[in-house]
């Protein structure tokens, strides 16, 4: 069930207030030192570089203090995992088509800035930690899609080189062959 935006915003404000009000104390220096910085969708807020493109993701390589990068994957019609946040191309590219309705070849010909998961893994895989958000969407061939993820991430160590982020607990079952410690369920409004 999707909440009206005004209700979602109020609930978000309430949650932030409760967290701020109930937080017992400032983190200790040890806790601060244990924190890791992740770039959200690469250089998410840089108007010169569209989010989740190879340029925005690879930019983290220039920053030693950035531990890793968070990005989302969506599946094309021919079941290739692409690095993209939205189900359609409207917000980033001004096109209302859905990624799931295009083959990877069509997508790459018309929107060459959108990388495949494989390209991102090859470029960043062992150099920066990957936080891969698996979106809640229709999975027409879940066994095949799981195999594709396994093959794409085969050279990396789950939990050391990457984690999966899930907003939907149902998706957790689709990743059954990956170690549980490499799968993080995230709560909240996103």
Each language-model region and where it sits:
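Phosphate-group recognition and catalysis centered on beta-loop-alpha active-site segments
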Residues: 1-190
């Amino acid at each position: 069930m999707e909440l009206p935006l005004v209700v979602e915003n109020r609930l978000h404000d309430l949650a932030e207030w409760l967290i701020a009000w109930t937080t017992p104390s400032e983190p200790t220096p040890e806790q601060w030192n244990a924190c890791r910085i992740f770039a959200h969708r690469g250089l998410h807020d840089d108007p010169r570089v569209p989010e989740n493109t190879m340029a925005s993701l690879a930019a983290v390589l220039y920053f030693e203090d950035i531990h890793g990068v968070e990005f989302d994957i969506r599946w094309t019609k021919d079941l290739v995992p692409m690095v993209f946040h939205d189900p359609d191309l409207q917000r980033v590219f001004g096109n209302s088509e859905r990624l799931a309705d295009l083959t990877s070849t069509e997508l790459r010909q018309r929107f060459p800035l959108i990388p495949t998961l494989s390209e991102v893994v090859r470029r960043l895989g062992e150099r920066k930690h990957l936080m891969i958000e698996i979106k809640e969407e229709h999975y027409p061939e879940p066994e095949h899609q799981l195999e594709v993820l396994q093959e794409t991430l085969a050279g990396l160590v789950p939990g050391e080189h990457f984690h999966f982020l899930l907003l939907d607990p149902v998706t957790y079952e689709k990743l059954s062959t990956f170690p549980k410690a490499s799968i993080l369920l995230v709560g909240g409004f996103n």
